[in-house]
Amino acid sequence: MNALKAILYYFSIVIAIIFLGLPYAYFHCYRKRDWSDYTRICCYFFPWLFPKFGIDVEVEGKENIPDKDGFVIVSNHQSFLDINVIFAAVSHTAFVAKSTLWKVPYFGWVLDRTGSIPVYRSDPKKNAGMGKKIAERTAKGYNFCVFPEGKRAGDGVMFRFQNGIF
């Protein structure tokens, strides 16, 4: 049953991308030439979707998140839902993510348009200046999420942090 639920969950996301995400991208972002809030639609969609699949999300400490200043979330990557929860809780979120994700259709396009920054695992020299890019963009109000372990830790055990931005 859990596998079927997961398939339906992701199918719902695909349908939402087609009927909400792409029109929002065109009518709001493309025409205004402003992609900074492309992820804002997620702040409404995921809180609506989670209860439909029995997903209970509790956000603690949201009062500590600045309203206007950019900030960086450093999080343990525990499950496939982490990114969805972050999108639901925090608008204008970009990610520091492995560069191979930019090759995934649509997903890579969204990462690029939202100001996300790629981490090059195969060529660490390309990562030079990443901290400066993050600092510049947070000064402009961007929010970033970093999963410093570099992969999901499904059992809750923390992996050693990768030295991409640290």
Which functions belong to the PLM regions below?
Residues 56-166:
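Soluble catalytic domains of membrane acyltransferases
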Residues 1-58, 109-110:
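A transmembrane-helix-recognition feature enriched in membrane-embedded lipid enzymes
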